[in-house]
Swiss-Prot record:
This is Metallothionein B. Residues 29-60 are annotated as: Alpha. It holds the Pfam family Metallothio. Belongs to the metallothionein superfamily. Type 1 family. A divalent metal cation 3 binds at residues 14, 18, 23, 28. A divalent metal cation 7 binds at residues 49, 54, 58-59. The gene is mtb. Metallothioneins have a high content of cysteine residues that bind various heavy metals. A divalent metal cation 1 binds at residues 4, 6, 20, 23. It comes from Oncorhynchus mykiss. A divalent metal cation 4 binds at residues 32-33, 43, 47. The keyword Disulfide bond does not apply. Residues 1-28 are annotated as: Beta.
Length: 60
């Protein structure tokens, strides 16, 4: 199962009141991908999740 639900639906919620579109949060700084590492303050747009961690090049 793909850890990034938004890659299939194009939208998702990233916790609390955060809303996402195209796998990017529109109202918070964290990526909507739950597999992004917690020390990532923001994941680059178009980030592809592999397994349960983002590639480090996703972090910005």
């Amino acid at each position: 199962m793909d850890p990034c639900e938004c890659s299939k639906t194009g939208s998702c919620n990233c916790g609390g009141s955060c809303k996402c579109s195209n796998c990017a949060c529109t109202s918070c700084k964290k990526s909507c991908c739950p597999c992004c590492p917690s020390d990532c303050s923001k994941c680059a747009s178009g980030c592809v999740c592999k397994g349960k961690t983002c590639d480090t090049s996703c972090c910005q």
